[in-house]
C-alpha cells in the first residue's frame, strides 16, 4: 500500500536533508615539512611559495631569516595526496634551477598535549660561547621539551658591546614544580651572568 501523501512528503524531506558521503566527499589533508637554504637574493621567498601555491598547497606555518649571506626557510604545508606528490616533484625541479638546497619530509599534525604547560624564556647577556648549549642542557636534563627557539646577536645601544639574546618556548610537564624549576633556572642564570625571565606563555 503506498504511503499517505503527508508521510511521503516527509520521507522526501528527510532524504533531501540526509548527508551523502562518498570517498571524495572530504579529501584527507596531509602535511609536509620543507626546509630550504640558498644564497640571499631578491625573489627567493617568491620562488618557493609560488611552487607551493601552484601545486595547491597551503602554508600553515613558516620561519624565514637571513643567516650571514644565506637565506633559510622552514615551512609546514598542507594539501591532499595529489598536492603532496606534485609538490615533491616540483621541489626537486626547483632545487636544480634556483640554487636552493631543499629537503622535504612528510609529517603528521602534532596532537595536543594536556600534560604539559607552555612557558616562555627570555635571556639577554653579553655574547659568550655556550649560552644556548647550557640552556638546552638545563631543560633537557629535567625532561622539558623545547618547542621553539630564536636567537640573535647585536650591539648594545650605548656601549656597542656585543650582546646575545635568546627566546624560547618550553613545554613543562604538569608534574614539575614550577616554583622549584624557576629557582633552579635563576641560579643557573646568576652563575652565567644572564638576565632572564621564565613566565607562562601568553597566546
PLM feature segments, named:
Residues 27-203:
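A conserved regulatory-domain signal marking ACT and ACT-like small-molecule sensing domains
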Residues 11-27:
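Short, Lys/Arg-enriched N-terminal segments with co-localized hydrophobic residues
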Amino acid at each position: 500500500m503506498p504511503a499517505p501523501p503527508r508521510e511521503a512528503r516527509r520521507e522526501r524531506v528527510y532524504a533531501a536533508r540526509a548527508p551523502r558521503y562518498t570517498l571524495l566527499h572530504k579529501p584527507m589533508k596531509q602535511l609536509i615539512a620543507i626546509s630550504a637554504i640558498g644564497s640571499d637574493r631578491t625573489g627567493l621567498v617568491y620562488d618557493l611559495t609560488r611552487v607551493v601555491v601552484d601545486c595547491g598547497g597551503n602554508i600553515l606555518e613558516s620561519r624565514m631569516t637571513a643567516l650571514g649571506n644565506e637565506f633559510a626557510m622552514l615551512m609546514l604545508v598542507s594539501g591532499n595526496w595529489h598536492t603532496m606528490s606534485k609538490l615533491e616533484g616540483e621541489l626537486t625541479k626547483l632545487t636544480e634551477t634556483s640554487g636552493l638546497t631543499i629537503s622535504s619530509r612528510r609529517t603528521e599534525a602534532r596532537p595536543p598535549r594536556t600534560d604539559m604547560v607552555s612557558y616562555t624564556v627570555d635571556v639577554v647577556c653579553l655574547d659568550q660561547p655556550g649560552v644556548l648549549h647550557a640552556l638546552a642542557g638545563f631543560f633537557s636534563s629535567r625532561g622539558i621539551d623545547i618547542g621553539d627557539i630564536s636567537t640573535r646577536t647585536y650591539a648594545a645601544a650605548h656601549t656597542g658591546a656585543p650582546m646575545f639574546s635568546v627566546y624560547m618556548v618550553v613545554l613543562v610537564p604538569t608534574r614539575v614544580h614550577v616554583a622549584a624549576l624557576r629557582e633552579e633556572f635563576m641560579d643557573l642564570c646568576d652563575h652565567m651572568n644572564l638576565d632572564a625571565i621564565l613566565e607562562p606563555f601568553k597566546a
